[in-house]
Amino acid sequence: MNHAHLGKVSDHSGIDIGIVSPDGRQGMIEHAQQFAEAGIPFVFDPGQGMPMFDGDDLMRFVDQATWLAFNDYEARLMEERTGLSMGRLAERVEAVVVTRGGEGSTIYTGTHQLEIPTAPVSDLRDPTGCGDAYRGGLLYGLGHGMDWEMIGRIASLMGAIKIETQGPQNHHFTRDEFEQRFKDSFGIRL
């Protein structure tokens, strides 16, 4: 993590979307700036890295990012450090996503607030990695130009699939399995 800043966005071609997630402080700062300078839309997801930044630092990330993503604890900390509510932050970016574990998630877009339900879970095995799985669904939906209702539900289902599997990244499925479970969970086709 302390060497993440050595990797440069410009070292890679064909990047359509990015994410700045918990890493070394300098790496997070530099990657956000590099994405912004390259005109590459990105999610700022500070996660457990948030304590490294004060309100001014966080506002610089907001000004560079296209989207923001937090869990409920991080959202409260973001509001405390910046003095802005999630709704006010959503006026500065395309959307703010706040996950709330088994309570679902909320997506703030400008003046709209979407409540995204959780997907049904058959077996609660291990929550480790659920946030990452959710972010994977978020990036998939954004990368495919989907609307927020679909993006949120894809991300929700990713978290549900993950929590049913022991280990942070041991879950797997086929596209057909995912599409069927999506239909069963939300009553709509993917």
PLM regions: where:
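Ribokinase/PfkB-type carbohydrate-kinase core domain
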Residues: M1-L114, E177, K183-L190
